Amino acid sequence: MGSHDPVGFADNIVALLRDGTSFTQPKQPGSSPRFDGFTVVSYVLTETPPHDGERHADGDELLLVISGECVAVLDTADGGTEETPIRAGDAFVIPKNTWHRLVIDEPCHIVFVTPGPQMEHRGLRG
């Protein structure tokens, strides 16, 4: 495959590195790999992720909702949470170092643009 050939976005991850280079690699089961730059990946989520939140120390995360709807739950400075519905056609920015999670009530196709390589997860809900 040449360097300018398209790849199937449903099956691949795009890494946009801080040094200005990029590459693609096939998706693997489980969480996405972490790169020194941004990981761009597309998922169709059918259920709420099992962890109780994550945060990114390297920058803001961008969510682009392609279809469906979900709720972004962000921790607030006063110890509470803020819930924001995000729908097909919406872009939503999660600020750097903000604990957040998604609640999925219907299938939701989202493109994630995630800074890396640092990411932290809280424990499993339940």
Regions found by a protein language model. Name each.
Residues 2-9, 101-126:
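Double-stranded beta-helix
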Residues 32, 50-57, 74-75, 83-85, ...:
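Short histidine-centered beta-strand/loop micro-motifs
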Residues 36-38, 45-49, 67-71, 78, ...:
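Short, charged/polar surface micro-motifs in flexible loops or helix N-caps
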Residues 42, 74-76, 96, 104, ...:
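Residue-level recognition of conserved beta-strand positions in structured domain cores
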Residues 76-96:
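Short acidic-glycine-tyrosine-enriched beta hairpin
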